[in-house]
A protein has these predicted regions:
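Short helix-initiation/N-cap motifs at beta->coil->alpha
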Residues: 31-42, 95, 132-170, 269-272, ...
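Short glycine-centered helix-capping/turn motifs at secondary-structure transition points
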Residues: 21-22, 46, 175, 194, ...
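Secondary-structure end/capping motifs
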Residues: 224, 229-301
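Short helix-loop capping/hinge motifs at secondary-structure junctions, enriched
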Residues: 91-97, 127-129, 228-236
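Amphipathic alpha-helical segments that form well-ordered structural scaffolds
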Residues: 117, 121-124, 171, 291-301
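Short, glycine-/small- and polar/acidic-enriched structural segments
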Residues: 6, 13-125, 134-143
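Pocket-lining segment of extracytoplasmic ligand-binding domains
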Residues: 145-256
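Tryptophan-rich aromatic "cage" segments
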Residues: 288-320
Length: 320
């Protein structure tokens, strides 16, 4: 019997084999629904059975018990190191995590998974969160205005909401903040005269050192499914996870073959193979336990949760 499953997800390139029907399953008919931003609570939406979901928002829902009809699956659609996500001006004297102590940092979402991991870099380097003045606003003038982005976290003592939602890039270039935490690079970032750079000039080597210390690549977005769908189709999580992983692996194989899509993609592929184990993006609960325990600890240290949770609490479903 073939089951139909509708998955809301961003348009990651590694879903291309699924979209081209290069990945087949006799038991799963997967419909990918492309979204530009992740739904706040996909369980309340009628047009999907599963969704890519922020790890932070999932964990916070678990913490407050507001996770009705949501099953977290330990399959991480998005992972990423965070050193690369700290930006400053091209001519800034700041070059290390430690240099951020006592500075002004802008970010577009306080509770975001990525920013939680980025603040963890500060804590590891001995930089207290309380030593920094934080400003919440949109990244660029093309991003939507959201005066509620800081609700529950703005205290007007250390954490502020910019009253005009002035773009963070503008605040940085006007020297009103010293750095930005951002998951995705702003528009025109790759233009030669844009004027921003990663805080750490050697951010790649710093990320390798981080991996050697911790042993995982931080999870950012997970796969989540509706509980009533899983109850009706208990085989669905395993079918979906292996279908998605097959697509990712096929896409990686194609990138290794057709590396001329960008001039130096081959260098990145070689460096990844040399610096990371083949299972750097593992599937399953036990393989991700250490990462999830640390994320739960960081949420508690950063006062995103009032109780320190752990991997077992965050992921009661152990079917994968």
């Amino acid at each position: 019997m073939t089951i139909h499953l509708r998955l809301k997800t961003r348009d990651w390139d590694f879903w291309t084999p699924i979209l081209l029907n290069d990945i087949h399953s006799e038991n799963l008919d997967l419909e990918l629904i492309r979204v530009q931003s992740l739904p706040d609570n996909f369980a309340q939406e009628n047009d999907c059975d599963a969704a890519e979901m922020s790890l932070s928002r999932y964990a916070m829902r678990r913490n407050t018990g507001d996770d009705q009809n949501i099953v977290g699956i330990p399959f991480f659609i998005m992972r990423g190191f965070r050193n690369r996500c700290i930006l400053t001006l091209q001519d800034s004297p700041l070059k290390t995590i430690e240099d951020l102590k006592g500075k002004r940092i802008g970010l577009s979402g306080w509770q975001d998974s990525g920013n939680t991991w980025t603040r963890a870099l500060l804590l590891e380097a001995g930089v207290p969160m309380e030593s920094i003045q934080w400003t919440l606003s949109r990244m660029t003038d093309s991003d939507p205005i959201d005066f509620e982005r800081g609700d529950g976290f703005v205290d007007n003592r250390l954490v502020f909401q910019d009253p005009q939602e002035t773009p963070l890039v503008d605040l940085l270039k006007e020297h009103k903040i010293d750095a930005i935490f951002q998951a995705f690079m702003p528009a025109h970032y790759y233009d030669k005269d844009f004027g921003l750079r990663q805080l750490q000039p050697d951010f790649v080597s710093q990320e390798k050192k981080w991996f050697n210390r911790w042993g995982f690549v931080p999870g950012i977005h997970l796969l989540a499914m509706k509980e009533d769908y899983v109850n009706k189709h208990p085989e669905a999580p395993s079918l979906l996870v292996h279908h998605l992983r097959a697509s990712q692996l096929m896409w990686l194989a194609k990138r290794r073959k057709y590396f001329e899509t960008t001039p130096w993609l081959i260098e990145s592929l070689i460096e990844m193979a040399k610096s990371l184990p083949t299972d750097w993006d593992p599937i399953g609960f036990e393989a991700n336990r250490k990462m999830l325990d640390e994320f739960a600890r960081q949420q508690y240290l950063q006062k995103l949760t009032s109780v320190q949770r752990d991997a077992d609490f965050l992921f009661p479903y152990k079917g994968i």
